[in-house]
Design a protein with these regions (language model features):
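Active-site rim elements
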Residues: 122, 151-154, 173-177
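Glycine-rich active-site loop/lid subdomains used to bind and stabilize high-energy intermediates
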Residues: 1-151, 197
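PAPS-dependent sulfotransferase catalytic core
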Residues: 194-208
Length: 208
């Protein structure tokens, strides 16, 4: 008899819940390392790490991080959001090469979205981009299609425009505390309301 349910989409994008936000600032330091050190020592070591079948494993994260070592930090953020590399995408879409999907340059779409924001802090710039681009084109579309296929209505309270506007005014250090604690403000607000084993557990994700 259920006709509507609540989904938590949007919290990661407005309150900094992804590891890529931490990776962005690490990447800025990584790019300052000597090129020979990155290309001839670190990258070969990371490339030799054995592949793991674990969900979003450490070797996968490191390889994606290092592969973006020569990009700007904003471009790196865009590539970390992609599932397929440009070459893999071209091979997969070759049979339909004349389609808009095959010709789309996803990285340029990210750059265009970054150019739309006048936020000064890097974290707020990323949150804007992910809210405007990643959230509607990846997260929300999956939920919308699955729910509509079963005649269900999904409500997303974290995307209430008043909450989104409030989150945009919150200082970045209350979203990503000491560049370590993701969604810090939300977790602090829920302290004592949710068990710690739920509140502070590692992010599970919903990968498809």
């Amino acid at each position: 008899n259920v006709r509507a349910f609540v989904k938590d989409d949007g919290a990661d994008e407005i309150l900094a819940g992804y590891e890529t936000y931490q990776a962005y600032f690490i990447h800025q330091a990584y790019r300052r390392l000597p090129s020979w050190f990155r290309h001839h020592l670190l990258q070969p070591l990371v490339d030799r790490l054995p592949a793991s079948d674990a969900k979003v494993s450490w070797d996968f994260k490191l390889k994606r991080f290092v592969a973006a070592g020569d990009l700007s930090s904003e471009d790196a953020h865009g590539t970390w959001r992609m599932i397929f590399s440009a070459n893999a995408r071209a091979r997969l879409l070759d049979p339909i090469k004349n389609s808009p999907q095959a010709s789309a340059d996803v990285l340029n779409l990210y750059r265009a979205t970054f150019a739309q924001t006048n936020a000064r802090h890097a974290l707020n710039r990323m949150l804007y981009v992910d809210t405007r681009f990643y959230l509607p084109n990846d997260m929300l579309v999956k939920v919308d299609r699955m729910s509509m296929a079963h005649g269900l209505e999904v409500r997303v309270p974290f995307l209430d425009h008043r909450l989104v506007e409030l989150a945009a005014r919150v200082p970045p250090n209350l979203k990503l505390k000491h560049f370590r604690h993701k969604k810090y403000l939300l977790k602090a607000a829920m302290q004592g309301r949710l068990p710690n084993k739920i509140l502070w557990r590692r992010k599970q994700g919903f990968n498809i």
